[in-house]
Amino acid sequence: MRSPYNFIVKPLNNKRYNNTKKIGGIDFVTSTSQENHIASNREAIVISLPIIYNGPIEIGDTLLVHHNVFKFYYDMKGRQKSCKSFFRDNLFFVDSEQFYMYKHNNKWYSHDRYCFVKPVKTKKSIIYKNTSEEPLVAEMIYPNTYLKKQ
């Protein structure tokens, strides 16, 4: 089963939400809200590649997806519905614009035009700075292919 334009993925650990934390061998629920974007699972396992896709991502790789990909929502009548990305049996369509990074062979890579930076700590100077990080200064951690060519 392959889609012409979308990746077919399933949530990591088959869970749409990461809303539990194990403390002392007991699972505690950290959020019961399905609207809470912080509890949404953001990692997906690639099940199938798009037919037109020709790139480095392979079946079994992990994608870092948008927080709305796996979410439930409620319609106008209060009925629970799956998001527009839902396909069937805990499988979802993911467009190339809906994910930012992918993990291949246990190493993360940025996807498409996205890049990821790490803030730089404020350096001591004569001028007092009331911040812990330098404004508008960062270290490139995961560059995209366009930036690598520059």
Protein language model regions, located:
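Acidic-enriched and Gly/Ser
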Residues: M1-Q150
